[in-house]
Amino acid sequence: MLILVINNLAQKKKFETLQKSLDNKIKIMDKLIKSSENKALILNKQLEAFIYYLYNFKNDSSIYQLLKPKSVVGKKKIRIGSLKDGGYVLLNDFENIKFAYSFGISNEISFDKDLADKNIDIFMYDHSIEKLPFYNKKFHWKKIGLTEKKNYSNNMKTFKELLQENGHTNEKNMILKIDIDGGEWNIFSDIDNEILLQFKYIVVEFHFNDLCISQYQKVFKKLNKNHQIFHLHCNNYDSIIKFDGCYICKALEISYIIKENNSFIKFNDFFPVTNLDYKNCKKKMDINFFLNVYQFDNIISN
């Protein structure tokens, strides 16, 4: 029996329930570890993450709480894009979606191709490449980068400028995908909420670097105002880091859906989710089991 000593936990009854359930949860977590290498160390970190979450499960400003996923009632998750790096999880609901915006292209456009196959026009931007890997009549690419402030450069524009150029200032029900290697923090810090409301889905690969915790909190609180996280995935090309007392992946893929006209229930999936989650790097160990810290909600409430 695993014994945890945790002080200052107000709800003793819930903690007793946690102690009784934790051993079984550890066994389940153990099965999710894809490699026996450093297994004890990995499991120890997972337990530390659980304990930290337990301390903070009522703290709305903790990173774990700001990233808490929920399930969407009546909607099924599907994978869009490749079964490796470049694919993301959305829902099987594309009704009335005509346009998508994709920032950060490089040479991986399987996500964009799958959306194009659904008759969605993709407005694609990346100032670091010379051309797309292949042509599609639904692709609308420009060698332009995304910036948070107007800077009068020919190859850098704000989100608002791009929406105006494309005639989408009043468009709703769009899809947004952003993977711009750390630039996402300033973009989301400065973007108007009215622009975010134009997007039904928002999928982002967030890169945790040297920014202070307050900027992370600001961005996630802003996104959580009108959108709900329904899926998380760790990019295993990078590693696990610890900041503000918690473990998190340095590159974390997050899928949001707009709250309006949707209902949500408690999240009950274990990561990685079969047939949805795939390793970004097939040669490296999967690290998505760290996200199962959210199973504490189910332990505490049962």
Model features per residue range: what roles?
Residues 1-43:
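Boundary detector for helix-to-coil junctions that initiate low-complexity/charged tails
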Residues 75-153, 208:
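SAM cofactor-binding core of SAM-dependent methyltransferases
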Residues 25-94, 108, 154-172, 208-302:
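Rossmann-like AdoMet/SAM-dependent catalytic core
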Residues 98-99, 175, 201:
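Structural motif
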Residues 137, 198, 250-252:
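Residues that flank catalytic or metal-binding motifs in active/ligand-binding sites
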Residues 111-113, 134-135, 186-191, 213-216, ...:
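A short acidic (Asp/Glu
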